[in-house]
Each structure stands twice: as C-alpha cells, then as structure tokens.
Amino acid sequence: MAICSTDNELVELLWHNGGVVAQPQAAQARVVSSSGRGQSASVLTGDDTETAAWFPDTLDDALEKDLYTQLWRSVTGDAFPAAAAAGPSSHHAPPPDLPPPAARPPMRSGIGSSWTGDICSAFCGSNHIPETAAQRCRDAGAALPPERPRRSSTHDGAGTSSSGGSGSNFGASGLPSESASAHKRKGREDSDSRSEDAECEATEETKSSSRRYGSKRRTRAAEVHNLSERRRRDRINEKMRALQELIPHCNKTDKASILDEAIEYLKSLQMQVQIMWMTTGMAPMMFPGAHQFMPPMAVGMNSACMPAAQGLSHMSRLPYMNHSMPNHIPLNSSPAMNPMNVANQMQNIQLREASNPFLHPDGWQTVPPQVSGPYASGPQVAQQNQIPKASASTVLPNSGAEQPPTSDGI
C-alpha cells in the first residue's frame, strides 16, 4: 500500500513482525527474479499506473539496484536470516529452500520451485533457479520419512508408501497409537474368545462325564434290581411247585389256580377231621363252630360204617382250641353235652354194635363192657336184672355121675 507524504515522497506501509512499518521509497519498487537461463523479469506490485508518475526517467540502473537491495534486505532481514548467506553469483538473496510437504513427492523436471509465503503484504514473487546435485540430495533427504513411522507402518500393514528412494507417510501423527490400541484390543478379544471357548469345552466335558457316570450308575442299579427280582421269583416258583405236589390231582400251572386248589383242599381236610372227631366221641376236642358243619345223620352212626374212624385211636389228641369265633354256640350250653349224657350215649352205641347181626354173622355177641362209676345207666341195670332170670329159666342136663348124692338115697 503506497501513500504520498507532504514532501512528495512515496511511503510504503509494510507488515513486519505483527506491526505496520512506514518506509519511504525513492525509486520504483521492482521485484527481480532470476531464472536458470540468466533472464530476469520485474514484477510490479499491481499499482503501476499510480506509482509510475513519481519515478523520474533519468534514474540509472545502479540506483535502482541499490534501492532494491536495501529494500529487500530490510524486508527479509528479520524474517529469513539465512538469506544473507546465499551464493555470490546472484545479485539478490534467494529465500531458503523449505522442505516439501510430506504428502507431495519430489519434482522430477529438473527445476525446483520454491515459494515464500507471508513475506509481506505488498511484495510477492517466484524465484526459479536451476536444480543442482546437492539440492537434489537435500530434497531427497527431506522427503524421506522418518524411521519410526516406517516401523509402525510395517507393524500395522498400511499407512506408508515408498517408490524410487522417496516415500510419504500419511497420517503419521495419530495412526501408530491408534493401530497399536486396535491391535491390542483385537488381541484381547481373541484371548477372551479363546478363554470362553475353553470354558465352554470344559463345562461340556464335565456335563458329558456326569451324564456317563449317572447312566452307568442307573444301569448298575437296574441290573441289581433285576437280579434280586429274578431270585425272588425263583423262590416263589419253588414254593408253588412244592404246594402243587401236596395237592392231589392238581394239574394247574398258574399260581392263582394252584392257590385256589390248595384252599379248597384244606377246607375239605378240616371238614373230614371234624366229622371223625364227632363219630369217635371226641366232642370235647372239637374245634369251635365245627358242629354246624356236621350232618345230623352222623350222630349215632355206626363206627364200622366209617373206616377212616378205625385208626383214630392211634392218633394223638389235639388240645382244645378255645378261640372265639362269630356266631359260635358254646359247647356246654346244652344238657346233652354233660358227662352223664355222654356216658349214656357211649353205652347205647356199644349195645347197638353188639346186637347188630351184620357185624356178627356167626351169632357171637360181644358182651358190652361194664361201666364202673357212680353214673349207672338205665339199660345197664336192666341188663343185670335179665341175667339172673335167664339163669333161672335155663334147664341144665343131669347125669348120674355128676349128680351129687342126696339125703334120700342115703
């Protein structure tokens, strides 16, 4: 920005270190740039029409060079201290070569382009110089990525690319740490999944082993139960066969039928025993309630008609079973069961046996035994009375030899 002062001098306002600096100008401000072929070009500030009238035409080139050198040094002295140490062949101090950005590969055209940004608000220019071997090596060294990001990129598998001795690192500020954390997270997830798989396998193995153990235990218990049940059935079958042998004319095979036959056989045996006891005068030894099963015709029946009663004398008498039974009539409730009546019944039975012609076909009659005791029955007394009568009415044959001498014959 150019401002005219009161002394008809051109004053230029420059931005230097955060402040505005006013500097007088006596010559036309030009920016000279040198190329590799030695040509120079002047670049005006874009305000040529306004400033051309203030510069005289008689100024020589030496004055212009001196003014430009002073102006350039004052502007770039503080911003670029290394510009004063440039080569002596150039008539102005070139700006220092900045390293190219990390994302841009080096130029291959043989001509390096360097530009300076934010030098001043009024002057801007480009300086094209031929590229030398030292400069090319320096550019290649600056373009090479550092060693540490390359190791992290090889560990991560992405993020670096190199070609022809030069490379570029994309996102070198945050990718290594993020990739490392992602790798660690992935490793933790893998380890957790492996541990969970191992735990699942262990639980499945324990469950399968417990199932096998439980199944073995159940099968063993079932085998023991089957064996004990088989033994019990064998014992029952043996007992049933023995019972079947005791029952006459039993040809049943099933257990229920065999038990029914045994019950019926026991009932018939009990009835026969009770009848035999009644016919042989063993009424006091009768079972309670057995008289109701005895038929009336059995009372007073001849013992000779019942062959089974002949051997009852050899049997040992059983004790009296005094068990209470429902609807039982006591044995001594009737007067017929008294001892006197029992003795009379026995004598009557013996008298009928003695007078039975079928039992004594030869006419021989047995003399009934005399019953001794205070209880003398009526028929016994009558029989004793008949004996003297028979002896008195009987005529005995007389023989002389046998007759005793009488008193008449003396």
UniProtKB/Swiss-Prot annotation:
PROSITE patterns, sorted: BHLH (PS50888)
GO BP terms in the entry: internode patterning; negative regulation of red or far-red light signaling pathway; positive regulation of DNA-templated transcription; regulation of DNA-templated transcription
Organism: Oryza sativa subsp. japonica (Rice)
Name of the encoding gene: PIL13
Pro residues bias spans: 93-104
PANTHER family, sorted: BHLH DOMAIN-CONTAINING PROTEIN, TRANSCRIPTION FACTOR PIF3
Region (Helix-loop-helix motif): 234-269
GO molecular function: DNA binding; DNA-binding transcription factor activity; protein dimerization activity
Region annotation Basic motif: where it falls in the sequence: 220-233
Keywords from the named record: Activator, DNA-binding, Nucleus, Transcription, Transcription regulation
Annotated localization: Nucleus
Record's protein name: Transcription factor PHYTOCHROME INTERACTING FACTOR-LIKE 13
Residues annotated as domain bHLH: 220-269
Lineage: Eukaryota, Viridiplantae, Streptophyta, Embryophyta, Tracheophyta
Stretch list, region Disordered: 82-110, 137-225, 357-410
